[in-house]
Amino acid sequence: MPSTARSAPPVGPRLLTQLAELHRRHGDVFTMPGVGLHVAGPALAKTVLANLGADYAEHSDFFATATGFLTPRDLQQRIARQARDLLTAYTAAHAADLPRLVVNLAPEAVMPDAGNRLLHEHLGPVLLAAGTDPSVRAVVADVVTHAVLAGARARRGRLRRALLRHRAYAALAAETARRRQDPARVPTDLLDVVALAMPEGYDPVQAADVFLSLLFATVGSTGFLLSWALYLVGRRPDQADAPPSALVRETLRLWPVAWMFGRPAARAHHLGPARVEAGQTVHVCTYLVHRHPGHWPAPEEFRPDRWLGGVHGAYLPFGWGAHACTGATVATGLVADILSPLLAAYDVTVCDDALQPQVGPALAPPPHRLRLTPRRHGRR
């Protein structure tokens, strides 16, 4: 999944409501005061993200680093492809581990953190293989706790965040350099994928940031997707027996983790009725695309059965075009594979009321307690 939607507008508890109201009043292209132009229509959203007319600067949310975008494009593609293939092989080989991990959530789990930690435990060996320096493992675990979990960054001061960033960069740079010393080494984990793909004279900060993007995508975004799916089923237990793949798709429709994609205009042009100036950022809001009343019947309702007929056109949970997330199938398949044994074995109930999503660069579920009660007769 995309690591984050890095160009999201300022966050706040009422932001989604404000965006929906602006969409209702002004249509599929509208301006949010102080933020800029937003797109809520699927056709225009695809136009912006596909960028076939080169109206926007080449942009990849995943490969944005502290020192600029990792380039060239073929390097991005090589890393993305190798990471996807490694994750695909790992998840297939370790699918039998999932029922054991699911049991650890019972009888009650604090979500969404428990979902992120489940993903970290399951994917730990493909993030950092056996033999990785223990200090690197420790700092990556700290990054999960203090940066990946929903709301974690807001709970730490700027200085402590900076110190953690410095520790992570130093540890990952040293481990990357060590791994590159072996000319015969082949990728056995995601850090290898990044380390061995980087060219001579590479920027160690960029290498570290790309690995951290992989960490955020696998443990963060995919963990949020899992938690959202369980949250929705916990609110609508009558939907628990829907096909897991349909549950995942409908979850991503209602609550796309990557909910906002910003694209800077490379030149002046028109987008629908709006004039876009060079340098202006256009925000594609997939949250609004996925709830567009002109494209979805009962858009606010959780209805997994709407996916039994195939994929809908007004659906962009992983972006669109050349820079769409290459790991989409891995992420959705893994979450479906977790839901299958979990919902076969347990009824799930959300124990808290009147909850609001955590709106930030990623759209995360609200903190809540999820109760898992053993099913007497399995799935109906």
Task: Explain the meaning of each model-derived region.
Residues L123, L190-T251, V335:
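Central I-helix of cytochrome P450 enzymes
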Residues G53, C285-G310, C351:
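Conserved cytochrome P450 K-helix/beta-meander segment immediately N-terminal to the heme-binding cysteine loop
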